[in-house]
């Protein structure tokens, strides 16, 4: 039944499913901004082509190193999460791939139960069947929460740095990508030291993976 529901949800989805509640900008004829109309969430959708390559590399390096090799589920990471659950007696968010996180953010609640985790897995598999890896990354980076009311990396770039994501430096990109794992713990306003520490970890991951050089 859970699998059938996952198939139904993803089959009914399209690109617009992942663009809901976006912020609209009203421009004057000379190109100046007249007003900004916010949806339920403060979010600006940008295509993956408009994002710096470093944004994709950074988020994959910290959230889901095996993203381009799995089909929605990282079974080893999931097994580690199960072991931790058995030891601690509670369901944690660990073990979720980028695709599973997208499934949770778009189609499910944030409830931490095993049933929800199973639903997450089914939906993630269906998402991988229907959409390309680039599409999944685009949907993810436009919908994840970056704290302080900002949904999506463009909204976060404007909110924290007053710049478009395509204009961010590598350090700024890594800084933003540090936040979604735990927007409270890594809140740049109240816990900036934590954000900076995780940013440095991301940069080290990227360096170790050969995605950037010491010169960057």
Role assignments for model-derived ranges:
Residues 1-216:
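Juxtamembrane regions of bacterial inner-membrane/periplasmic proteins
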